[in-house]
From Swiss-Prot:
It holds the Pfam family PseudoU_synth_1. Formation of pseudouridine at positions 38, 39 and 40 in the anticodon stem and loop of transfer RNAs. The active site is at residue 53. It comes from Methanocella arvoryzae (strain DSM 22066 / NBRC 105507 / MRE50). Substrate binds at residue 109. InterPro entries: PsdUridine_synth_cat_dom_sf, PsdUridine_synth_TruA, PsdUridine_synth_TruA_a/b_dom, PsdUridine_synth_TruA_C, TruA/RsuA/RluB/E/F_N. One of its GO terms (biological process) is tRNA pseudouridine synthesis. Belongs to the tRNA pseudouridine synthase TruA family. This is tRNA pseudouridine synthase A. One of its GO terms (molecular function) is RNA binding. Keywords: Isomerase, tRNA processing. Its EC number is 5.4.99.12.
Amino acid sequence: MKTALKIAYVGTNFYGSQAQPGLPTVESELRKALEEAGAIKLGTKIAMAGRTDAGVHALGQVVAFEQADPKLTAPRIINSKLPKDLWAYARAEVPDDFDPRRHATSREYRYILYAPDVIERRLKECSSRFLGTHDFTNFSSVEAGKYPVRTVTRLDIAKRGDFYIIDIEADSFLWNMVRKIVTALRLVGENKRPDGWIEKMFDPEYREGIPPAAPGGLYLSRVNYDGIAFEEDEYARQRAYQRMLNSFEWHHTIAEIYKEFKDAMK
């Protein structure tokens, strides 16, 4: 049997999820922690449900590996070896052939967009056009050999003050697909692109490059599977909650200072 873990991380200090020589990544820090805890043997492959780029976060990333000792794969044990911005909080026993990427039925991302000048009605009208099966060549960064057709099953937008909370679910995603969709939504919402532009962008013969939205607003919220039951580690969750509460208080204070400095410089 293998072990699957649900992990979360604040991606600000990581150079993405995949290992890169000489750089701090989610995979490299997790591997070091698992090896130090005795949960895996040296060189054991660690598979992830999805790749996240530098600066992108995750709340529901899933990793799987062949365990050396099941008792040592408990989230609370692994977390004692991890940096404070990366933690595990749930665990499942999975079959030897389980692949967290290939066996996922869908993935869900959330983007938190600060956009006080967006017209809410246009943003929400535009969002429905992404639903269904489309060619997302113009809404992704080109990867050689990647089939560009994807099916978006859900795209919800909720307003929270000057922020828009954008939730998107699909069978799978192309590189930078979510962040480029967010850019497109914003362009339409700010009246910088006309009606019908989204449909035009779905034509792979038409090419218009748009930049991806900033990575810091994006996180992988959930990966869905059939027949996999994760058991949450309540102690690990509570420790993570307390760390997040402390960080929230600090960053909320800094945000207020930035606001006062901004107002003073008007």
